[in-house]
Amino acid sequence: HVIPPAVAKAGMDTGAARRPIIDMEGYIQSLKARMDPTAAIMQGIHARARQAQARMIFAEGDEPRVLRAAVAWQRGGMGQALVVGREAEVRDQLEAAGMGDALREITVVNAANSRHLETYHEFLYSRLQRRGVDREDVLKLANRDRHVFAALMLAHGHGDGLVTGATRKNAPVLAQLGQVFDLRPQ
């Protein structure tokens, strides 16, 4: 994807080109789309994501891969990255990955300090009380399980999307999410 645009630019610079390319970036994107059909699909997805400016919740804030994804989301102009975790741990992981400056860009959400925690507890208790879960268990679940806390954020509109499951297999994560959302098809 580098050589054809360079040839076109050289042709314009030397006067050999019949028509100048006004939008070089658009020309490069159209070449990529012709050479790789999946690139066109991904470009459309990225364009829609940038336009929507979604608040994406990243549940596993102590995982380096997740933090890199959150920073890429934020820096890529996709929207706001909300990372669930303890600020000190997130800072240490970012510094270890060489991205210490990214802490100013992302938003770290700690379950223990959330002002919405009481609302989350009441919501989760209303869902789980008939399954034999008492209030104390609900408090522990919402405070300690980052997947459940992130799902509660999403359920209450404090985020637009959720990225989770990087450190566990799908089934246990879906089981945790099932405590907040109805996962069965209607």
Where are these regions (language model features)?
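Adenosine-phosphate binding glycine-rich loop
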Residues: 1-17
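Anion-binding alpha/beta catalytic cores of soluble intermediary-metabolism enzymes, centered on
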Residues: 18-21, 25, 29-186
